[in-house]
């Protein structure tokens, strides 16, 4: 199994590479690519960690050597948020980066599962889909927007509030991956009850947690370490499912039946070909139903921007 991390010299990429070097199954290949010349050095550094995962680093303009034979490609390339920016401010730079990388994937490893981390995810996933479609290789079961950070934040904050072990908390998060489009389904957390006040406070905290980190880092970056952990969790789940493990479920932003929007995050059963089944997210509370309805215009608008960028 070969996993390629694209954007591997950045804050998310390095954290993700470290975690994957430690946690990928024995015999896996890990390829790191970034435009930055430091990338082979990042791989050399990680290669000294004693795990049965082989690692190679590539730099320069062309990601092809890193992509060749990849089963999973995780894209974290692009610029990070700074104070005062929201995820959509990143669009002007990151849209072009995702477009050109996806064009390379379409030629080099068109059958790979692709996990997009680069923000704004609501839009960059639509860009990747349109690029793959133009190249005649689009498989909607193999393209994912990685929204796992919203899930792990939800699990952490719920566990803190309710004094539980975060490893035992599961919170489905649906919608998209920015601001109001992030909808944690607190009504569905097993074994935990919330007051209306708790839901009203916790929901925006989860939605704005990225901004919390951007401001706390005071211009020194955005959420890189927790995002690395989230991307590792999603990447490992993909690897397990592709290897034949049954019952692997993660929330992700994928093209489904289009009920709410062309792309929508909800629980996905993963399998040998990527998306095995898009699972129902169950019944929503009145609060969640209202939040869902009021976010859809924003989400659809984000998707449209991505589609039009490639036209």
Curated annotation (Swiss-Prot):
Gene Ontology CC annotations of this record: cytoplasm
Principal EC category: oxidoreductase
Active site: 177 (proton acceptor)
Pfam families in UniProt: Ldh_1_C (PF02866), Ldh_1_N (PF00056)
Record's catalysed reaction(s): (S)-malate + NAD(+) = oxaloacetate + NADH + H(+)
One MF term in the entry's GO annotations: L-malate dehydrogenase (NAD+) activity
Highest taxon in the source lineage: Bacteria
One GO term of the biological process aspect: tricarboxylic acid cycle
Entry keyword annotation includes ATP-binding: no
Residues noted as binding NAD(+) in the record, renumbered to the chain: 7-13, 34, 94, 117-119, 227
Residues engaged in binding substrate: 81, 87, 119, 153
Keywords on record: NAD, Oxidoreductase, Tricarboxylic acid cycle
The protein's Enzyme Commission number: 1.1.1.37
Subunit organization: Homodimer.
Stated family: Belongs to the LDH/MDH superfamily. MDH type 1 family.
Function comment: Catalyzes the reversible oxidation of malate to oxaloacetate.
PANTHER family for this protein: MALATE AND LACTATE DEHYDROGENASE, MALATE DEHYDROGENASE, MITOCHONDRIAL
Official protein name in the record: Malate dehydrogenase
